[in-house]
Amino acid sequence: MKHIRNFSIIAHIDHGKSTLSDRLIQVCGGLSNREMSAQVLDSMDLERERGITIKAQSVTLDYTAKDGETYQLNFIDTPGHVDFSYEVSRSLAACEGALLVVDAGQGVEAQTLANCYTAMEMDLEVVPILNKIDLPAADPERVAEEIEDIVGIDAIDATRCSAKTGLGVEDVLENIVAAIPPPEGDPEGPLQALIIDSWFDNYLGIVSLVRVKNGSLKKNAKIKMMSTGQVWNIDRLGIFTPKQIDTTELNTGEVGWVVCGIKDILGAPVGDTITTAKDGSETPLPGFKKVKPQVYAGLFPISSDDYENFRDALGKLSLNDASLFYEPESSTALGFGFRCGFLGMLHMEIIQERLEREYNLELITTAPTVVYEVETTRNGTVYVDSPSKLPAVNDIEVIGEPIARCNILVPSEYLGNVITLCIEKRGMQVDMIYHGNQVALTYDIPMSEVVLDFFDRLKSTSRGYASLDYNFQRYEPSNMVRVDVMINGERVDALAIITHKDHANGRGRDLVDKMKEFIPRQMFDIAIQAAIGGMIIARATVKQLRKNVIAKCYGGDISRKKKLLQKQKAGKKRMKQIGNVELPQEAFLAILHVGKK
């Protein structure tokens, strides 16, 4: 056991976590040069296309150190985006240490801080690594000072490396062996193993990634899931090198995968404890705290025949992504679907794309909303995650809007732009601290403004240098109203939005204008209106397509032309009474484009 080292690699987006993982695998001979590819751990097509890590991946490597001993390194490559911070905290729960990778050119950024604090809260040993020292813009001395100043950990002798060229990777490995403590646990005690992650395999059933805390897991042994009480037989178990390799047992302190032939999606929940069926442990390990979704949106299959497949797909995906929340929902415009909760907009995009790719579904997404706390005159407090669930205006005492605490790190030359943006988003300044050239800003901004397009706007106003980390702070009373959209006089529930009263007229106007761009012209006029209660605040008309009925009249009397035009008008009127308007997917997401030029 004293030769085992469990650690995670944490960093801000694009600071080189996955590339460093590749180098560690190569140096330790986990894969031959022929099998090696860039970002070998980003196994999903989506991850490779976007160049980001979405799922944490674990690898077991053997490393012979300079002291002649062979160490078993179990490490987990984690995502960097704020939307996937839950993946990071789960990965850290399985480790004794973390490599904090910092780009020697960019320096400390917001996610560096957030992930590092998560690791410190869990009492992990944090080892700073300065990456990308081969870049012309690299300034390791300045960045080491920044780490000490902003993060508050000792970084004078931080290991310097370049994951791209492989320079200094040996030093990183030596540092891991020296600085990260071996796991603690009782090899002779009753079995306790924590499920860090699960996913569904069509042939094997549920595959679970586990960390053995006490005791050992053996092939063909009978085990019990502590949350469900079900007993299973271990069919196969093993480690990732990153190939899936079978072994006969997993001992205390090791990380590996287990297959028990479980077909029920709820059979092996993430955060559950595995113990032996006979003489097992009585107490489960502390699991993970449940995360609350911040953004809700309706997902509906375009074809109603796909509803069953869609439900199964969501079940399998939620097994793999424990932060996804979903419940059935029906809409008059879109039929049956699900109301899904996500951690942020990127998370929502990724889930939708995974559902469409991995399960061949065609989906329509409604505009995302956050959760409002509504105090009603009759039913006490209700939480509203969809505009259609908002009670009638005369039943509402007060609407509480969720406020996010945003920590922004920005170089001082872009400070003015960022403050202007925060004020535009109804933000309140809480704190401002200068660290050399960097400024740490803390703002309280309404969550609805943050999740919509704040991150994109922040990046563009600071040329990509500002970085953001946010979390839910509290609910605050606010003057919110629901803006309904009517098409030819009919309310479309899936298009309603909740917005601040001061912004309602502008938002309504913009929304109607955007919808006009996206709805194709029909044979009759389409009136698009935005309304608050019974008051219409904006209108746009998509003009009808019409045939030139008087083209065949050359000379002759004007009354002949009038007669033909009147006849066409009567036909159009009749058509409008029975005609349906088909809305494309873009029309449902027009709200996302509101305010963008």
Curated annotation (Swiss-Prot):
GO molecular function list: GTP binding; GTPase activity; guanosine tetraphosphate binding; ribosome binding; translation elongation factor activity
Known catalytic reactions: GTP + H2O = GDP + phosphate + H(+)
Membrane topology of the entry: Peripheral membrane protein
Keyword Cell inner membrane found: yes
Pfam families, alphabetized: EFG_C (PF00679), GTP_EFTU (PF00009), GTP_EFTU_D2 (PF03144), LepA_C (PF06421)
Keyword field: Cell inner membrane, Cell membrane, GTP-binding, Hydrolase, Membrane, Nucleotide-binding, Protein biosynthesis
Database matches in InterPro entries: EF-4, EFG_III/V, EFG_V-like, EFTu-like_2, G_TR_CS, LepA_C_sf, LepA_CTD, LepA_IV
Domain of life per record: Bacteria
One GO BP: positive regulation of translation
Chief site of localization: membrane
Sites where the protein binds GTP: D14, H15, G16, K17, S18, T19, N131, K132, I133, D134
GO CC annotation terms, alphabetical: plasma membrane
Localization annotation: Cell inner membrane
tr-type G domain boundaries: 2-184
EC annotation from Swiss-Prot or TrEMBL: 3.6.5.n1
Role this protein plays: Required for accurate and efficient protein synthesis under certain stress conditions. May act as a fidelity factor of the translation reaction, by catalyzing a one-codon backward translocation of tRNAs on improperly translocated ribosomes. Back-translocation proceeds from a post-translocation (POST) complex to a pre-translocation (PRE) complex, thus giving elongation factor G a second chance to translocate the tRNAs correctly. Binds to ribosomes in a GTP-dependent manner.
Similarity field: Belongs to the TRAFAC class translation factor GTPase superfamily. Classic translation factor GTPase family. LepA subfamily.
Name by which UniProt lists this protein: Elongation factor 4
Organism: Photobacterium profundum (strain SS9)
Organism taxonomic ancestry: Bacteria, Pseudomonadati, Pseudomonadota, Gammaproteobacteria, Vibrionales
